C-alpha cells in the first residue's frame, strides 16, 4: 500500500467494495498551509512518466527537471522523480509531459517524493505574483501562524496567532482573494495577520523589499 492510499483509507473517502468510484475528496488549503505542511516544495518541469506495478491500480512515476527548491533542502535536496497514484479516484495527479513548469508540493516516504490531488500543485504561469513572493520568503515567515478556515458565519479567531480565512464565504469560492494575494505573517507584538505586501509590516521580521 502506498502512502497516499493509506491516507485515503484514513479519511474514509472510499470503501473497499467500491474501488472504482470517484472518491478523492480534499479540504481546501491555503497555499501557505500547503507550503508549511509539505516536506518538499519545488518548481519543476515534467520530462517523462511511467506506470509501475505498485498498489491496486499502480503508481505513476514522473521524471522531472527541478528548476528551484523552496522547501525540503534537508529532506531531499534534489528531486528527480515524483510518485502519485495512477487512479484519479485515489487522488492520483495527472501532469503534462514536456509542456509546463509546475509548482509541486508533497511528502517524502522511504526516500521518495509523493504528491496527489490533495497537495497544492499548480502550473507556474497560473500563480499570482503574491504567491510567487510567498514561496520565496513570505510563507516561510508565517509557518508559526495558523490559518483558520471559515465556511459559514459567524466565525472568529480564538488566539493571536490565527488569521481568519474567508475565501469559502465569497461568491467566487476557492481559490479566492486571500489564497491568491495574502500571506498570514506574525507581526510586531506577536500576533498574526494577513499581509498583502506593499511594504514590510515590520523590518525586524521581514528583511526584504518588494520590487
Swiss-Prot record:
It comes from the Eukaryota. Its main location: secreted. It is found in: Secreted, Extracellular space, Extracellular matrix. Residues 24-143 form the NTR domain. The record marks 85 as: Involved in metalloproteinase-binding. Disulfide bonds join 24-91, 26-118, 36-143, 145-192, 150-155, 163-184. SUPFAM superfamilies: TIMP-like (SSF50242). One of its GO terms (biological process) is visual perception. InterPro entries: Netrin_domain (IPR001134), TIMP (IPR001820), TIMP-like_OB-fold (IPR008993), TIMP_C (IPR027465), TIMP_CS (IPR030490). Residues 1-23 form the signal peptide. Zn(2+) binds at residue 24. GO terms for cellular component: basement membrane; collagen-containing extracellular matrix; extracellular matrix; extracellular region; extracellular space; nucleus; platelet dense granule lumen. Belongs to the protease inhibitor I35 (TIMP) family. Interacts with EFEMP1. Interacts with KDR. It is linked to Sorsby fundus dystrophy: Rare autosomal dominant macular disorder with an age of onset in the fourth decade. It is characterized by loss of central vision from subretinal neovascularization and atrophy of the ocular tissues. Generally, macular disciform degeneration develops in the patients eye within 6 months to 6 years. Mediates a variety of processes including matrix regulation and turnover, inflammation, and angiogenesis, through reversible inhibition of zinc protease superfamily enzymes, primarily matrix metalloproteinases (MMPs). Regulates extracellular matrix (ECM) remodeling through inhibition of matrix metalloproteinases (MMP) including MMP-1, MMP-2, MMP-3, MMP-7, MMP-9, MMP-13, MMP-14 and MMP-15. Additionally, modulates the processing of amyloid precursor protein (APP) and apolipoprotein E receptor ApoER2 by inhibiting two alpha-secretases ADAM10 and ADAM17. This is Metalloproteinase inhibitor 3. It comes from Homo sapiens.
Amino acid at each position: 500500500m502506498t502512502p497516499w492510499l493509506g491516507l485515503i483509507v484514513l479519511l474514509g473517502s472510499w470503501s473497499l467494495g467500491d474501488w472504482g468510484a470517484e472518491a478523492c475528496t480534499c479540504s481546501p488549503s491555503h497555499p501557505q498551509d500547503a507550503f508549511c505542511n509539505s516536506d518538499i516544495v519545488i518548481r519543476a518541469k515534467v520530462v517523462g512518466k511511467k506506470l509501475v506495478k505498485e498498489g491496486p491500480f499502480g503508481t505513476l512515476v514522473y521524471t522531472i527537471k527541478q528548476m528551484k527548491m523552496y522547501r525540503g533542502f534537508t529532506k531531499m535536496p534534489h528531486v528527480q522523480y515524483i510518485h502519485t497514484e495512477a487512479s484519479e479516484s485515489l487522488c492520483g495527479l495527472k501532469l503534462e509531459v514536456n509542456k509546463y513548469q509546475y509548482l509541486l508540493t508533497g511528502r517524502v516516504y522511504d526516500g521518495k517524493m509523493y504528491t496527489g490531488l490533495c497537495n497544492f500543485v499548480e502550473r507556474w504561469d497560473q500563480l499570482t505574483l503574491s504567491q510567487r513572493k510567498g514561496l520565496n520568503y513570505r510563507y516561510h515567515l508565517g509557518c508559526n501562524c495558523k490559518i483558520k478556515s471559515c465556511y459559514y458565519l459567524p466565525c472568529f479567531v480564538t488566539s493571536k496567532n490565527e488569521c481568519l480565512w474567508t475565501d469559502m464565504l465569497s461568491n467566487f469560492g476557492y481559490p479566492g482573494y486571500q489564497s491568491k494575494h495574502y500571506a498570514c505573517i506574525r507581526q510586531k507584538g506577536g500576533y498574526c495577520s494577513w499581509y498583502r505586501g506593499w511594504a514590510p509590516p515590520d523590518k525586524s521580521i521581514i528583511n526584504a523589499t518588494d520590487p
